[in-house]
Amino acid sequence: MQVRAALTKRLSLIATKDGFIYTQSPVLDSGFADIAAGLKYNLYRDAACGRLLSVGATFEIPTGSNRSLQGNGNGEFHFFTSAGTRVGSRSHWLIGSGLREPADDNLENRVFYLSNHFDRQLGDRPLYAFTELNWYNYGSSAAAFPLPVEGGDLFNLGSPGITGNDLVTHAIGMKAKPRRNVEAGVAWEYPMTARQGLMDNRLTADLIVRF
């Protein structure tokens, strides 16, 4: 679950990670996720052209369940930037990149990522098809996890022997916008690289409500 609240016209308080992890994976159990929160600042916004640029930072507190591979380490700083533009009258391109920097690099891994999202409206209906491409590059190894396994976007395992490794995933999905303040979507994601980390494939459903 994520929560975002505007503090000013440009500055927002964001809670980007919390809630409960439900999994059928043989290597972990269901449990609570860590909590991450911080600030996001809008550097540029042009509503007429559909363009925006933002930067932000969060800190992840290791409060989650160990059985869900959460609650490890001494916390993680996340520094990021995101941008978006309207393409023509029916499409949007969004890009985000960031650095996940552990408070203790012996317990968690340093990760750089780059994510791209492209969507297109289907006719005049409030329905959008989209595709996403995500790249994770591991900048450090650690000694907290027994195996050289990458954790992707949800986990920071503190794995050994993964410095320089890359994980690339691709997702396709659909999103509906029945009202101006409501969005609902579903996506199927799978790894494209030989190294898969903890991901075989993943089905994600989301619901966004704006107040």
Regions found by a protein language model. Give the residues of each.
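Residues that define the transmembrane beta-barrel architecture of outer-membrane proteins
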Residues: 1, 30-35, 51, 71-77, ...
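Residues on the lipid-exposed face of transmembrane beta-strands in outer-membrane beta-barrel proteins
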Residues: 1-5, 37-41, 57, 79-85, ...
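Repeated loop/turn-to-beta-strand initiation elements of outer-membrane beta-barrel proteins
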Residues: 10-15, 46-50, 89-94, 124-129, ...
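Transmembrane beta-strands of outer-membrane beta-barrel pores
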Residues: 17-23, 43, 59-65, 99-103, ...
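Hydrophobic alpha-helical segments and helix pairs
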Residues: 28-76
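Outer membrane beta-barrel transmembrane domains
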Residues: 117-210
